[in-house]
């Protein structure tokens, strides 16, 4: 059994850094006139409730995504990343933190093809319900 559960750490400073880099990479690939495939070897649940028991137990998102969310202005380079956050938190309140597959899907747009893998068996059903996703 795997002991790591990302729901305790979603939206922390390392997650934010990883997802900013991901959004910049996807933006760069989209500039090319060639197709590309998104492969995620640790896709996780896809979306995390920041007010969940797990997230509140560690509170790591308070020093990560919450600090960015509360900023009045951000560098233009973060526009793709922040637009994804706004998409999943359309009420204006920070409630959800999207994982890598949802960030990539939102930035890539249609048509997209995702190949997602996850070792936690209980997270695989959330992976399979994503349209155009191949899950293993």
Locations of regions flagged by a protein language model:
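Glycine-rich His-Gly loop
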Residues: 11, 41-43
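Class I S-adenosyl-L-methionine-dependent methyltransferase module
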Residues: 36-37, 45-136
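Gly/serine-rich nucleotide phosphate-binding loop at the start of the catalytic core
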Residues: 32-40
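Acidic active-site catalytic centers that drive phospho-/nucleotidyl reactions
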Residues: 18, 40, 118
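Class I SAM-dependent methyltransferase Rossmann-like catalytic core
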Residues: 1-33, 49-63
């Amino acid at each position: 059994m795997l002991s790591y559960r990302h729901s305790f750490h979603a939206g922390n400073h390392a997650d934010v850094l990883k997802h900013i880099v991901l959004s910049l990479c996807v933006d760069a690939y989209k500039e090319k006139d060639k197709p590309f495939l998104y492969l995620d070897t640790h896709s996780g649940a896809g979306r995390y409730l920041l007010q969940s028991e797990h997230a509140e137990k560690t509170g790591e998102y308070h020093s990560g995504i919450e600090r960015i969310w509360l900023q009045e202005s951000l560098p233009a380079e973060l526009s793709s990343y922040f637009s994804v956050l706004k998409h999943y938190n359309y009420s204006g309140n920070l409630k959800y933190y999207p994982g890598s597959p949802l960030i990539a899907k939102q930035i890539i747009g249609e048509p997209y093809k995702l190949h997602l893998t996850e070792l936690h068996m209980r997270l695989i059903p959330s992976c399979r319900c994503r349209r155009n996703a191949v899950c293993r």
